[in-house]
Amino acid sequence: MERKAETKAPVPVIERHKSGYIKIRVAESLQDITLALKMYREGFTRNAAQRAFMAWKAMISALTVMNLDKLPRNEEERKWYHRVGYKAPKAGLRWLADRLEDIGYQDYKLTHITSTALALHRYA
């Protein structure tokens, strides 16, 4: 009699490379904000605004991945976080900031900074 192998749900890619992804996104954020400041000083305000937005998006992505176990409230949200949420898509940026504040980041004014970042993105 042949035994069927137990099939486990595959581990999402982001879970396998969590710490590396966080380090890369934080480094990207720091590089982008440094570049944004340089561009701003040189008079390239629209380019600087876009770089500042990208820096914030990378930071929200890093915070999201750091808290992947705490953020989802149900199975549907968990799937979304593992599929696209960890990338901090522009359309979900405000929602991610709200969720991060809900789980303990309220002192950092993430929604306020996110609103400013989105305004910079519109300007760019």
Task: Show the residue positions of the predicted features.
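Amphipathic alpha-helix face/heptad-repeat signature
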Residues: 25, 51-52
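Charged alpha-helical initiation segments
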Residues: 1-45
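Alpha-helical solenoid scaffolds that mediate protein-protein interactions
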Residues: 36, 55, 62-63, 69
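Long, charged low-complexity segments
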Residues: 68-124
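Generic preference for hydrophobic/aromatic residues in regular secondary structure cores
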Residues: 12, 24, 56-60, 117
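Short, structured secondary-structure boundary patches
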Residues: 10-14, 20, 61, 68-73
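Solenoid-repeat scaffolds in large eukaryotic assemblies
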Residues: 48-49, 55
